[in-house]
């Protein structure tokens, strides 16, 4: 079990599994966007040209297949909805992730 009022530097899924149901009042998160391609200045840009957008994720490839990306978010959302009374999930639908995000919205429609 995690102690309250402490900061833990750990994988979010590992940490979430250590929390009790409904033990968090509010979660605000901005998950990785899986930016394989991105529209920049009205044009599609390859990941190589927009590398500085993805560099902040040192331990996350940000270049997952749609299936891997969906599974990652499904696991995180399942745990967030279990431990939190309210979840604010800031998400931008970018080119490389649209189908996974829309599937997640459909799969979690009754819970969100």
Language-model features: locations:
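Core catalytic lobe of class I
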Residues: 2-112
């Amino acid at each position: 079990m995690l102690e309250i009022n402490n900061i833990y530097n750990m994988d979010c899924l590992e940490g979430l599994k250590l929390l009790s149901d409904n033990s968090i009042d509010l979660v605000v998160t901005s998950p990785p966007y899986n930016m394989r391609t991105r529209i920049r200045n009205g044009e599609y840009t390859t990941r190589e040209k927009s590398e500085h957008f993805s560099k902040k994720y040192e331990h996350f490839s940000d270049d997952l297949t749609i299936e891997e990306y969906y599974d990652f978010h499904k696991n995180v959302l399942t745990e967030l909805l279990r431990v939190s009374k309210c979840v604010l999930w800031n998400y931008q639908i970018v080119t490389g992730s649209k189908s996974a995000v829309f599937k997640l919205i459909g799969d979690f429609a009754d819970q969100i």
